């Protein structure tokens, strides 16, 4: 019997994404000419074109003016604290039920968006870090991400202030994920979370974790061996150990895994490399398993790359608007993940087969853009004070 064939259309994608935002953000119509649906059409187009609201309003011929869209957005969004809760509800809006029933591997990372302006109200809004893209000022966001093939959803997002303890950030992210009924079976963390406070909190919360150990301690030289984590970096063979971190009067003990491998031209390097991992709550059977498991965390880096494929450009100092644009990109990415799992995957015995070639993330964004262009039209002219002369004729 011939298999049935179905299609997914751009209208269905647009209605699903818009419904998710309308349901969880409670967006209301600003005016007759600027309804919540029209506002979302403009926002989706700006995300797809990676431009600002101003440029998008100029691109869409019959769209409301840039000032109307700006006022509609400011009027429609709740205050900063309520906005964070609403955005996290939208991120969790498409999570499948099986994902909530069992504990999952999760990754937590910190994402820095370069910023070149002044703070809006509080200097703590601007996060300071190592210089990147010509600045050491950033808007910082931490996110939690489910590490599961085919269902790699971002389940929690929170802004990070200057000087904020990473333990507080991890605690807040796990609380948001718990509200969405997502619980960690294993937490994969970036090296930026390698601290006594974070480790002590996770151990007290009974959350198994795995993260790289930062190379600290005495360097080898002058007849003295390396000390601290640097001593593990000198190992020639893979193995196991333990290490105690000290911060003031507080201490934390972790298990150490050293995985040695040969560099065969990776990153233009050759020779031996020792990768040192700190973990707790696990009983790994090999150092290879530890290294391969931690590599799964790099999926969150892919989500950040896709975030930049859909983040609206802005020069506003308002941290609420900036947070909304970052969350909007992640929500659209979650919509893309949902469509691939629920509608575009092929059924088969065992685990369903993902068919990413059927709809790339950038193609989904273009669908949203084309929907808006079909409604408002595309501006194909611009005003000028000079009269041109047609010099070349066919």
Q: What is each model feature region?
A:
Residues 163-221:
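Domain-level cores of phosphate- or acyl-group-handling catalytic modules
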Residues 76, 81-93, 369-394:
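Long, charge-rich low-complexity segments
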Residues 126-182, 273-275:
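Electropositive, glycine- and tryptophan-enriched low-complexity nucleic-acid-binding patches
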Residues 71-147:
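Active-site-proximal, Lys/Arg-enriched surface segment
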Residues 205-307, 380:
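An anionic, glycine-rich sequence signature occurring as long contiguous blocks
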Residues 28, 285-293, 306-326, 343-347:
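Short, solvent-exposed helix-loop connector elements
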Residues 41, 53-56, 65, 69, ...:
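Short, conserved catalytic/metal-binding motifs centered on acidic residues
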Residues 1-73:
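Gly/serine-rich nucleotide phosphate-binding loop at the start of the catalytic core
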């Amino acid at each position: 019997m011939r298999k049935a064939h179905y299609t997914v259309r751009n209208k269905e994608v647009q209605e699903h994404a818009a419904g998710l935002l309308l349901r969880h953000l409670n967006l209301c119509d600003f005016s007759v000419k600027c309804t919540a649906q029209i506002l979302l059409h403009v926002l989706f187009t700006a995300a797809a074109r990676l431009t600002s609201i101003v440029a998008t309003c100029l691109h869409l011929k019959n769209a409301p003016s840039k000032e109307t869209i700006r006022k509609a957005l400011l009027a429609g969004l709740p205050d900063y604290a309520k906005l964070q809760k609403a955005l996290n509800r939208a991120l969790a809006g498409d999570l499948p039920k099986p994902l909530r029933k069992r504990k999952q591997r999760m990754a937590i990372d910190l994402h820095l968006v370069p910023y070149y302006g002044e703070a809006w109200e509080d200097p703590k809004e601007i996060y300071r870090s190592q210089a990147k893209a010509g600045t050491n000022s950033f808007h910082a966001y931490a996110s939690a991400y489910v590490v599961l093939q085919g269902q790699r959803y971002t389940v929690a997002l929170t802004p990070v202030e200057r000087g904020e303890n990473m333990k507080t950030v991890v605690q807040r992210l796990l609380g948001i994920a718990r509200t969405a009924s997502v619980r960690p079976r294993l937490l994969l963390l970036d090296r930026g979370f390698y601290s006594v406070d974070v480790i002590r909190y996770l151990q007290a919360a009974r959350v198994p974790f795995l993260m790289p150990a930062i190379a600290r301690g005495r360097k080898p030289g002058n007849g003295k061996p390396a000390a601290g984590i640097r001593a593990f970096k000198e190992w020639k063979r893979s193995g196991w150990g333990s290490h105690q971190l000290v911060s003031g009067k507080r201490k934390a003990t972790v298990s150490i895994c050293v995985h040695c491998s040969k560099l065969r031209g990776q990153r233009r390097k050759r020779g031996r490399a020792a990768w040192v991992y700190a973990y707790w709550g696990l009983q790994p059977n090999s150092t290879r398993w530890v290294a391969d498991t931690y590599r799964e965390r790099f999926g969150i880096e892919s989500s950040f790359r896709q975030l930049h494929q859909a983040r609206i450009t802005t020069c506003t100092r308002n941290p609420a608007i900036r947070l909304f644009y970052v969350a909007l990109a992640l929500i659209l990415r979650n919509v893309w993940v949902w469509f691939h799992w629920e509608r575009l995957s092929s059924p088969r015995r065992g685990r369903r087969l993902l068919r990413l070639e059927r709809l790339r993330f950038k193609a989904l964004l273009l669908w949203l853009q084309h929907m808006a262009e079909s409604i408002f039209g595309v501006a194909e002219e611009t005003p000028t004070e000079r009269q041109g002369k047609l010099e070349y004729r066919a």
